[in-house]
Amino acid sequence: MAARAERSVKRLATTWVATARCLLPQPNTDPLDPGEAQLWGRHHIAHLMVIFTDTLQTVTTPTTIRPMTLARVIDERRKATNTLAAIGHEVIADDTASRLASQAQRLLDNVESVLLATPGPPATVDSLVGPVRVTDQLRATLLAMAAMGLHDGIDIPSGAIIESCRTLSAVLDETHGGRTIELRVPPACAVQLAAIGSGPNHHRGTPPNVAETAPVTFLQLATGFSHWPEMRSAGRVQASGSHVDDVAGVFPVVDMAGVFRDIFADD
């Protein structure tokens, strides 16, 4: 069991590192050309550095305190947005984007060496927001990086999109689980949800209300980068059942679009 858990952490960590590298300019790109400087602005790079530093400190700080649930981890990190943004502003100081990018690359190398070491990080660690499972720290920060990719139009690994969808569906199951609507996101996940207000409570088999969408669309909906009515109108959601549009009420699961609009406003 321990070996299987360690392999699972390694797979997640590998996806985490690959995603982080996609969000940084290529090493030794100095100075950044105008297009790169616009894409990889100082606040973008500084926020990544905050994520890297937070993760490095967290995965090297074991704890025996009972970890919080994934949904609470996501919510507590949302509440800490202003704190993280303030740290990012301190990181920027008077540095250029090029110098920040070089620092971020070195920091990411350090994170990678810790995450992929054998043995790996402890199972439960002390984070910025309290005791968490190391996998939940990686999932929460991977979700933040996937949302950064959406915000900036940067392609990220498909594994990161799939993992982020699974994180979001787990949060939905914890916060809005029920037996009225089945939301399918093949091949990533499926989750059964309660209706908003009154609705049938199905006890066996597939609920009578079914919605299905692609992972990228689900990620956009769940992080606030798109909205249910427009995705329905565009044919990017297939739905059936009289209560299926109640799904709109659970989005966004976490409003990363609003967070990044504020953090990156000066880039």
For each of these PLM feature ranges, what is it?
Residues 53-109:
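Short, helix-capping/interhelical loops that line the mouth of catalytic, cofactor-
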Residues 47-50, 54, 141-151, 171, ...:
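Short, hydrophobic/amphipathic alpha-helical patches that form generic packing surfaces
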Residues 2-9, 29-51, 89-100, 124-141, ...:
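Alpha-helical scaffold segments that form or flank carboxylate-/histidine-based iron centers
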Residues 11-15, 19-27, 60, 100-191, ...:
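Acidic, aliphatic-rich amphipathic alpha-helical segments
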Residues 177-219:
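Glycine/small-residue-rich hydrophobic helix-like segments
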Residues 2-12, 16-27, 54-56, 61, ...:
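C-terminal interaction segments
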Residues 68-72, 166-175, 244-250:
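Short, mixed-charge aromatic SLiMs
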Residues 64-76, 130, 134, 188-189, ...:
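Charge-rich, acidic-biased intrinsically disordered regions
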